[in-house]
């Protein structure tokens, strides 16, 4: 709920500061570069770079959260701040690190999105819905599940768009609802500790 409220404030601030015009990032020939897999299948290089970046970031986060002292403290504080404080976790420091990681990841995601498509201050709501659906499809609390959920959502929308572009977003929502109905914990639920 706080994220939706914050997104409305940010959206209106961007409209006031920069206008509501649609924009895109210039990436030169990278925008049209692709890798031919044969059989008439071409994958855009920007998409491959985005997937590779996502895998690297998620892998790095997984290692950070499971192997570093700060990462373990972050996980503990997300479960119970008072108990984490008893073990020496400084809640303000943990929240500051978590916020820095979140904003850094957000900036990287924004750059990757800007290289693939145009954007405007009002585009965030739809992207936020897709992100929410990817997290739920993959499983709350599972980093790799979120990646899988995003891939399933994106591939479903792309496959349906090939046949009927008007139904692509609806198809993604149907997959989301099907996962909620048949596997509400997600495809890769987080392990309970």
PLM feature spans:
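Transmembrane helix-bundle core of multi-pass membrane transporters
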Residues: 1-67, 94-97, 159, 171, ...
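Conserved catalytic core of two-component sensor histidine kinases
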Residues: 3, 78, 130
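Hydrophobic/aromatic residues within transmembrane alpha-helices
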Residues: 9, 83-84, 136, 152, ...
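Conserved catalytic core of Hanks-type protein kinase domains
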Residues: 16-19, 77, 107, 181
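Helix-loop-helix "hairpin" substructures at the membrane interface of multi-pass membrane proteins
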Residues: 40-119, 143-149
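A helix-boundary/kink motif common to multi-pass secondary transporters
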Residues: 79, 90, 141-142, 165, ...
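Transmembrane alpha-helical segments in multi-pass inner-membrane proteins
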Residues: 100-106, 110-176, 181
């Amino acid at each position: 709920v706080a994220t939706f409220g914050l997104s409305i404030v940010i959206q209106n601030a961007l409209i006031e500061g920069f206008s509501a015009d649609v924009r895109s990032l210039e990436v030169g020939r990278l925008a049209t570069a692709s890798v031919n897999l044969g059989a008439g299948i071409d994958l855009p290089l920007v998409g491959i770079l985005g997937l590779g970046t996502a895998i690297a970031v998620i892998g790095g986060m997984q290692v950070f959260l499971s192997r570093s002292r700060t990462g373990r403290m972050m996980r503990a504080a997300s479960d119970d701040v008072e108990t984490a404080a008893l073990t020496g976790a400084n809640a303000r420091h943990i929240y500051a690190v978590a916020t820095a990681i979140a904003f850094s990841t957000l900036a990287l995601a924004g750059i990757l999105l800007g290289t693939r498509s145009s954007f405007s201050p009002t585009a965030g709501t739809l992207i936020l819905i897709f992100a929410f659906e990817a997290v739920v499809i993959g499983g709350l609390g599972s980093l790799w599940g979120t990646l899988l959920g995003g891939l399933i959502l994106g591939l479903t929308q792309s496959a349906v768009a090939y046949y009927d572009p008007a139904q692509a977003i609806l198809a993604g929502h149907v997959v989301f609802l099907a996962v909620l109905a048949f596997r509400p914990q997600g495809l890769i639920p987080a392990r309970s500790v």
